[in-house]
Amino acid sequence: GKRVVAFYTKEDIDLWNDCCARALAAAGAGPEDVCQVAYGYGLFTGGFGLNGGSQKLGCLTLPMSSGNTDRQLQFMEDLGSTVLCCTPSYAAYLAESIHERGLRDKIHLKAGIFGAEAWSEQMRQDIQKSLGIKAYDIYGLTELSGPGVAYECSAQTGMHINEDHFIAEIIDPDTGEVLPEGTQGELVFTSITKQAFPLLRYRTRDICILRREACPCGRTHIKMCKPMGRSDDMLIVKGVNVFPSQIETVLLEQGYTSNYQIVVDRVNNSDTLDVLVEMTP
């Protein structure tokens, strides 16, 4: 479909940078850190948002953008990057490249902030082990500002939503009825500080759960779980709701899978689901 165009006032950008700075601070980043931002820049919100948050926090900020792995690793080694911001799939690729080139002892990363795509808990564990870091999730969408709507803290038990900027609710995706906290449903947001592009109960299509609970980090903002799928990509096979992310979790737990493809069909009036898996050598 047509690309989403979002608008920002100067104050919107400043508040957005605050939200991203909170995410970085929750991951343990501070003025003494070197933050390598390997999200795309240009019209993509990822690079621009984390770049602003990193600068606001006082980090030495490396605006790398995505791709060019040779340059990424060179800067990571030469400038001593301690925080990495990128997609989880690119983080996994960088980890593989570091291992292949024997650079593990020359890389000093301590934390990573990964988002912009779905990733499983098993993928998190793999990245943490291979890079020797703590990997934190971050959530956002262009319509609300970009990354920084919600973020993980050191407890890694859900993402704190910046409730002073966004009101989160869970609704029934079919009826629109507001559901109580702790119930699975579709996540909707109302922006309360955005000036240029305010939204009222914007439907994200993300399926998750909200929980308000005491957190070891001391933050009191409500938490959202990692999205379990989307209301528009959930698969119903023989009456059972299936999320592709759940299949990914099972496959990655095996430890010997690479790429996979889910094929859903209907044969003789019966639903079928086949998972084609590429095995690692």
Where are the model-predicted features located?
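Short secondary-structure capping/junction motifs at helix and strand boundaries
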Residues: 3-7, 28-34, 61-64, 136
